[in-house]
Amino acid sequence: MKLNTLFNLNGAKKCSKRIGRGIGSGKGKTCGRGAKGQKSRAKVARGFEGGQTPLIKRLPKRGFKSMNKRNYNIINIITILRLVKANKIEYGAVIDKLLLLKLKMLKKSINKIKLLWANPSSLVLSSEDISLLTKLDLQFNLDEYSISARKNIIKLGMKVINN
């Protein structure tokens, strides 16, 4: 068996009907669209409901896009801790946008970065984790900090460079 000798069985592949090729073809003249009218001339517009007010116009307008919305890349202290444990952040490092981009921790570089402290109900920092963070003497140079993040960073002896 060779590729150039293969062929379809009879009736396996049906050719499409060629329209507009004369009355004898079975789909000539009006090409199966019938005589006159909107659907014979062109397609009906998307959303057109036959003269009835379309659904999109019947529904009320809702919401808007705020011009003053702040887009943040959210970084949690747990993420920083994981990077420290993986030896990607060394002693005395300045954690800023460039470092986080280099480590591929940010989705978009245009957004501001906000540091959050671990949520006490779900992500609890152990005493080992806290001692590890204090030994490293990290410095944070980010755009925003949650209130608890700023408070705990200063409490643990790390530095907040800006703000």
Swiss-Prot record:
One of its GO terms (cellular component) is cytosolic large ribosomal subunit. The gene is rplO. Binds to the 23S rRNA. Keywords: Ribonucleoprotein, Ribosomal protein, RNA-binding, rRNA-binding. This is Large ribosomal subunit protein uL15. Belongs to the universal ribosomal protein uL15 family. The keyword RNA-binding applies. InterPro entries: Ribosomal_uL15, Ribosomal_uL15/eL18_sf, Ribosomal_uL15_bac-type. GO terms for biological process: translation. The lineage of its organism: Bacteria, Pseudomonadati, Pseudomonadota, Alphaproteobacteria, Rickettsiales. Part of the 50S ribosomal subunit. GO terms for molecular function: rRNA binding; structural constituent of ribosome.
